[in-house]
Amino acid sequence: MTKRKLSKGQQRRVQENHKKRLQSKEKKNHVELDDTQLGEATEGLVISRFGQHADIEAADGSITRCNIRRTISSLVTGDRVVWRPALQTQENVRVNGIVEAVHERTSVLTRPDYYDGIKPIAANIDQIIIVSAILPELSLNIIDRYLVACETLNIEPLIVLNKVDMLDAESRAMVSEWMQIYKDIGYRVLEVSSYTKEGLEALTQALIGRISIFAGQSGVGKSSLLNTLLPPMEESILVNQVSDNSGLGQHTTTASRLYHFPLGGDVIDSPGVREFGLWHLTPEQVTKGFIEFRPFLGGCKFRDCKHNDDPGCLITEAVDKGEIAPTRFENYHRILESMSQVKVRKNINLDS
């Protein structure tokens, strides 16, 4: 018997009921600690967040699972906080502290959600590592979508092309030519292989002293790269076997978590950055997200120029003169077209 397809309203009610059940269970497991049971306030770092609890790393590197004060409206991996440890560790109780306050963020990585608006998924990020690969398929369009997201969030990107060991000399030269497009407009690009270790030293140096997050589609080798770069851990970032037929891996991260690199710097591994939706952006924001367009903006003949076949368009003139790469220009219009096809729209405050 064919299952009846749920409407969007029904799907939303199912999702809300699911959240209520989870919250109800969390309340039953919630252990309250009063002030007499708590030590002095101290600084900490959110390593991971689980519902009403968070794992907090102290200055000595120890990790304590804590309750979160109900007055804290938003807490994500990467947040720097003030917390208080329990004076005595309680037997059979996993929660041994409480988060009291959150420091102001230097940046916040967000993603759009159809029902909940803009959702924060990580804080204090310095750079986004855009991981792409020749398998399952090298898509410059997807790279450009990530770059627009980075520019909109004002977080520096680093493009990492993985699995270059699978290219022959001719294909490698062609791919390097494509990557030169991004280098020419000021983006950093690294060609690496987690298998042969090519380019990993340069990537390691780029990660030192920064908080990074790896973004990319499933199968491009994000988890393999992280397992190569990180020290051996009891709980490693799992990587499923890649199919011999498809060349695809499977994304196995289930909760955002922060890890430390041996030479310095941190990484947040999160399931929320498999892809960045752009449907909540305006066409103007997408246009500004193509950094090589910016010198020409405001100079077109018509104020409502669509930068396509409009007469007097400085951007199309720049493409004709070779000042803007045709592939980037084509991907710009592909992104706008994909946004126009999204029928569901919600008014979202991007500053929230």
Curated annotation (Swiss-Prot):
Disordered: annotated span: 1-35
Cofactor note: Binds 1 zinc ion per subunit.
Keywords: Cytoplasm, GTP-binding, Hydrolase, Metal-binding, Nucleotide-binding, Ribosome biogenesis, RNA-binding, rRNA-binding, Zinc
InterPro entries with a match to the protein in the record: G_CP_dom, NA-bd_OB-fold, P-loop_NTPase, Ribosome_biogen_GTPase_RsgA, RsgA_GTPase_dom
Matching Pfam families: RsgA_GTPase (PF03193)
Biased composition (Basic and acidic residues): 13-33
GO BP annotations, alphabetical order: ribosomal small subunit biogenesis
Cofactor: Zn(2+)
Entry binding sites for GTP: N162, K163, V164, D165, G216, Q217, S218, G219, V220, G221, K222, S223, S224
GO cellular-component term (any): cytoplasm
Domain CP-type G: 114-276
Reported function: One of several proteins that assist in the late maturation steps of the functional core of the 30S ribosomal subunit. Helps release RbfA from mature subunits. May play a role in the assembly of ribosomal proteins into the subunit. Circularly permuted GTPase that catalyzes slow GTP hydrolysis, GTPase activity is stimulated by the 30S ribosomal subunit.
Quaternary structure note: Monomer. Associates with 30S ribosomal subunit, binds 16S rRNA.
Name used for this protein in its record: Small ribosomal subunit biogenesis GTPase RsgA
